[in-house]
């Protein structure tokens, strides 16, 4: 009976209560004072070892997670530094379509795509739409968002050209910010491929106005996927400042891993505490 009660001493709320119980049991079993003291010290040592094991295990998990997190942030920062150019603006030509978007002259736009190419498209590309304020006041919405052969509107052209003034002007006159071209690409897709500080302002404004960052085009690519390409605003800096912080991408990329590791740590702590009872 004494042995059974001694095993239960480890399930008490505190060592003091366990110690009082051991003394009471020792008196009942006619144990000497020296035996009681020796047993109390052994109980205390086991209690300390168990508690130290818990603390050491928890600290090990925390140290492991912080090490992984710091190394990940460091690697992402270093990879971004290797991609920083010395000039501010670099044209992106990942495809024939991008060559048309960022054409060096209007001659690149004289193709079959321009069945619907208008003066508004040309001005959004190379001019200032604010000069046509009076004409836009009399336009309907479908006239403002007139499409060319690729399904692109003046708003799309202004966005891909990183013309923030034309973007704000068309937005003020009711242009649809949730529009898509014939390939299912949103304005965020177009902005993500640019390397201009004004395109970052447009990118942020589109997100603030509720444009879906995870909207997919016809090939299943999202604006986040476009940001992962080398020729995107995420990999360039203007005047010494990164256009998009590495922390934003880090949160997006490692949120799932963070939650998974956190649950693993909680499970281990619970298991250690449960089996030590």
UniProtKB/Swiss-Prot annotation:
Query: Which spans of this chain does UniProt mark as ANK repeats?
Result: 150-179, 183-215
InterPro entries for this protein: Ank_Repeat/CDKN_Inhibitor, Ankyrin_rpt-contain_sf
Q: Which UniProt keywords apply?
A: ANK repeat, Repeat
Q: Tell me which domain of life the UniProt entry assigns to the organism this sequence originates from.
A: Viruses
- Keyword Repeat attached: yes
State the protein's name: Putative ankyrin repeat protein L81
**What species was this sequence derived from?**
Acanthamoeba polyphaga mimivirus
């Amino acid at each position: 009976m004494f042995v059974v009660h001694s095993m239960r001493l480890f399930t008490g709320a505190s060592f003091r209560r366990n110690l009082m119980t051991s003394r009471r049991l020792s008196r009942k079993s006619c144990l000497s004072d020296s035996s009681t003291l020796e047993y109390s010290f052994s109980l205390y040592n086991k209690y300390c070892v168990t508690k130290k094991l818990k603390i050491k295990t928890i600290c090990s998990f925390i140290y492991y997670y912080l090490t992984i997190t710091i190394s990940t942030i460091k690697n992402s920062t270093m990879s971004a530094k290797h991609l920083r150019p010395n000039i501010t603006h670099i044209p992106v030509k990942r495809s024939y379509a991008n060559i048309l978007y960022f054409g060096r002259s209007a001659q690149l736009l004289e193709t079959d795509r321009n069945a619907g190419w208008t003066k508004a498209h040309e001005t959004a590309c190379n001019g200032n739409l604010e000069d046509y304020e009076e004409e836009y006041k009399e336009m309907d919405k479908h006239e403002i968002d007139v499409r060319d052969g690729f399904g692109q509107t003046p708003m799309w052209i202004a966005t891909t050209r990183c013309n923030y003034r034309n973007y704000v002007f068309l937005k003020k006159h009711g242009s649809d910010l949730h529009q898509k071209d014939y390939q299912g690409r949103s304005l965020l897709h177009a902005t993500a491929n640019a390397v201009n500080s004004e395109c970052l302002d447009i990118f942020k404004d589109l997100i603030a106005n509720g444009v879906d960052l995870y909207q997919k085009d016809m090939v299943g690519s999202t604006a986040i996927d476009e940001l992962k390409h080398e020729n995107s605003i995420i990999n360039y800096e203007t005047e010494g400042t990164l256009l998009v912080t590495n922390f934003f991408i880090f949160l997006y990329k490692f949120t799932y891993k963070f939650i998974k590791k956190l649950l693993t740590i909680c499970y281990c702590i619970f298991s250690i505490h449960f089996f030590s009872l």
